[in-house]
């Protein structure tokens, strides 16, 4: 039996808990063919398109608290990356060049020649690749809460305890098989510890952590897919070294939580672009859209205002 054309149940909008009031009046889950993969995206709103790229170990659901406000001005597209959520999980194709190409094909299918991008955590890696490899397609890009392999200066081998708690998963996730064998059946311990350590003092609600963990534990394929981007870090690092030969032409907003990476994303993005604005949100850990949705919306609204004002689609939406 083929999968339904409209996603339903766990992983989709219809199966997501504790959504903001009126969310399902604006947003729907869609399966979209993007070349050799079918991606799941949650789409809604009017105006120029805004692509939201989640991080690890999240999904489109990470953005749920900011999506309704952003949808007042933009058509919001919150995607599950290749290997994540309801999107296809092939064995290959997890370097950021391939992942960025997936998203270009996704936006092609939605009819968008140009769009803005927001990416956090591993979504920062993909968002940077998207902006660097397809600068004609990306009007503005907001990225945060991650190092860029091959660009961000490497950390020393011996790190402070609080840094180890936040970042030990990066080399662990790159293992070929051992990580899956250790985590399978213990997803709540592994991923639960990751959510807790990276959140800082303002922990995520239990229902959200449970939703993410249940999705990752739902099948061996889901668990496997969650590690694949990390296993491709070697290829991504080499690609980033080549990308560094070209400066990003579009404005960049570099974001961080004060209890997490702070201004590290800005320091990294200044190595790749000339027009870089810095946002550090006080009293917030790694999960910006979960922990400070109002502050994030305000910053994105200001940063994206020139993109909105220049868009013909915004004028049509306002007139209607």
Residue map of PLM features:
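Catalytic histidine-centered segment of alpha/beta-hydrolase-like enzymes
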Residues: 284-297
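Flexible "cap/lid" subdomain of the alpha/beta-hydrolase fold that forms the substrate-access gate
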Residues: 2-30, 36-39, 49, 77, ...
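A short, glycine- and basic residue-enriched loop/turn
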Residues: 59-60, 125, 285
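Conserved HGGG/HGGXW glycine-rich cap/lid loop of the alpha/beta-hydrolase fold
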Residues: 42-86, 269
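A short, charged, Gly/Pro-tolerant segment at domain boundaries
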Residues: 315-320
């Amino acid at each position: 039996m083929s999968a339904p054309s409209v996603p339903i149940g766990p992983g989709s909008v219809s199966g997501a808990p504790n959504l903001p009031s009126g969310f399902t009046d604006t947003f729907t889950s869609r399966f979209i063919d993007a070349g050799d993969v079918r991606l799941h995206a949650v789409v809604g709103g009017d105006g120029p398109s805004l692509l939201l790229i989640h991080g690890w170990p999240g999904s489109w659901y990470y953005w749920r608290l900011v999506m309704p406000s952003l949808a007042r001005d933009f058509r919001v597209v919150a995607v599950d990356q290749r290997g994540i959520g309801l999107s296809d999980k092939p064995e290959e194709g997890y370097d950021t060049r391939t992942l960025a190409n997936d998203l270009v094909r996704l936006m092609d299918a939605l009819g968008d020649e140009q769009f803005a991008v927001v990416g956090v955590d591993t979504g920062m890696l993909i968002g940077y690749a998207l902006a660097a490899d397809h600068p004609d397609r990306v009007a503005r890009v907001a990225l945060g809460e991650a190092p860029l392999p091959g660009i961000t200066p490497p950390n020393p081998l011996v790190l402070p305890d609080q840094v180890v708690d936040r970042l030990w998963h990066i080399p662990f996730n790159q293992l070929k098989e051992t990580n899956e064998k250790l985590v399978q059946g213990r997803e709540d311990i592994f991923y639960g510890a990751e959510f807790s350590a990276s959140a800082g003092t303002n922990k995520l609600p239990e229902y959200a952590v449970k939703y993410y963990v249940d999705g990752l534990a739902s099948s061996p394929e889901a668990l496997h897919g969650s590690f694949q981007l990390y296993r491709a870090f070697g290829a991504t690092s080499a690609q980033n070294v080549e990308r560094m030969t070209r400066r990003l032409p579009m404005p960049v907003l570099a974001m961080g939580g004060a209890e997490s990476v702070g201004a590290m994303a800005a320091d990294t993005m200044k190595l790749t672009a000339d027009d870089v604005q810095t946002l550090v949100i006080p009293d917030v850990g790694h999960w910006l859209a979960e922990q400070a949705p109002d502050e994030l919306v305000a910053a994105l609204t200001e940063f994206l205002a020139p993109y909105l004002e220049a868009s013909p689609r915004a004028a049509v939406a306002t007139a209607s």
